[in-house]
């Protein structure tokens, strides 16, 4: 993003210094090596606990001004374990992450690679040929797609815009898709082109450290359209307006509970009290559970 930063460098450098890591340091920044030249080479020992504050993420602001969401270290570690568990990730896997890392959705999917010791590839660009070429060159085994990107890939194949035989895709084992409802027709179409692919999707929000608190696993492709069941290490319930659990088939508010629930809305005790109750995160999303225990929103 050097070019983009250069365009606004004068504006954003007021009352702050800009540092650069890598070769060809631009004139608007100071090189990080110069900053650290006289610093000790040993790593400072900083004792951390699971309960220590780790990160602040911001909500999308769909219901008002974006809220600052505080998470601790246990929350971030749980996100990594959830991704590793749901995708069966090992150090041999290569995960392709396309969405930007400034939100929890992309970053927590990426964390599965960090805890597994596997490689993650970050791709800027969503054209079908970019995605397929990257999967081929980097030998990606897990690819996270949004619904429009998956549709674009299938359309490009159908139109002849891309030719699958040009790419080495045999190692690609899992197509993860999410961030919005997934049409069953899309997955049926995908399986015709990629019959050996496993498929999964999930549900989450920034307050639950991103995706995974509800998960539709690789063995439940017949339930496409649902968001799934409680994810690894999570509990879920659906309640009425009085907080009582509803019966299966009835509509109520989806609530989740687990190690990934936020600590609070930063410096907003009123909003925190409205959202966190007895350890449960009230998501604000209406949902129902079918006869097999699968949840739809």
Would you name each region that the model predicts?
Residues 77-94, 102-142, 156-157:
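Conserved AMP-binding/adenylation subdomain of ANL enzymes
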Residues 115, 140-145, 154-222, 235:
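Gly/Ser/Thr-rich phosphate-binding loop
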Residues 35-36, 59, 76, 228, ...:
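Adenylate-forming
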Residues 1-34:
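Structural core segment of the AMP-binding/adenylate-forming
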Residues 53, 59-62, 95, 101, ...:
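Conserved S/T- and glycine-rich ATP-binding loop of Class I adenylate-forming
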Residues 2-3, 67-70, 97, 119-126, ...:
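Short beta-strand->loop structural element characteristic of the AMP-binding/adenylate-forming
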Residues 20, 25-27, 37-58, 65, ...:
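Conserved pre-ATP/AMP-binding loop-to-beta segment of ANL
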Residues 244-249, 253-297:
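Conserved ATP-binding/catalytic segment of the ANL
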């Amino acid at each position: 993003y050097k070019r983009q930063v250069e365009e606004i460098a004068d504006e954003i450098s007021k009352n702050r210094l800009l540092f650069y890591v890598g070769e060809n340091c631009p004139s608007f920044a100071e090189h990080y090596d110069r900053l650290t030249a006289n610093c000790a080479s040993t790593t400072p020992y900083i004792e951390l606990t699971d309960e220590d504050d780790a990160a602040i993420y911001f909500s999308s602001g769909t219901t008002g001004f974006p809220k600052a969401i505080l998470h601790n270290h246990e929350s971030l570690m749980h996100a990594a374990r959830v991704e590793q568990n749901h995708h069966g990730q090992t150090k041999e896997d290569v995960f392709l992450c396309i969405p930007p890392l400034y939100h929890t959705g992309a970053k927590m999917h990426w964390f599965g690679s960090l805890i597994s010791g596997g490689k993650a590839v970050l791709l800027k660009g969503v054209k079908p040929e970019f995605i397929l070429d990257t999967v081929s060159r980097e030998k990606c085994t897990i690819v996270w797609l949004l619904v429009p990107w998956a549709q674009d890939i299938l359309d490009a194949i159908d139109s002849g815009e891309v030719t699958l035989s040009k790419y080495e895709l045999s190692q690609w084992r899992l197509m993860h898709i999410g961030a919005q409802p997934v049409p069953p027709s899309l997955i049926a179409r995908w399986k015709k082109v990629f019959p050996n692919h496993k498929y999964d999707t999930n549900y989450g929000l920034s307050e639950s450290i991103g995706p995974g608190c509800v998960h539709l696993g690789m063995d439940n492709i017949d339930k496409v359209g649902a968001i799934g069941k409680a994810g690894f290490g999570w509990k879920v319930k659906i309640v009425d307006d009085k907080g009582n659990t509803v019966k299966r088939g009835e509509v109520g508010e989806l609530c989740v509970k687990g190690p990934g629930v936020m600590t609070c809305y930063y410096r907003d005790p009123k909003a925190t009290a409205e959202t966190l109750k007895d350890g449960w995160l009230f998501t604000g999303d209406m949902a129902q559970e079918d006869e097999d225990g699968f949840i739809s929103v």
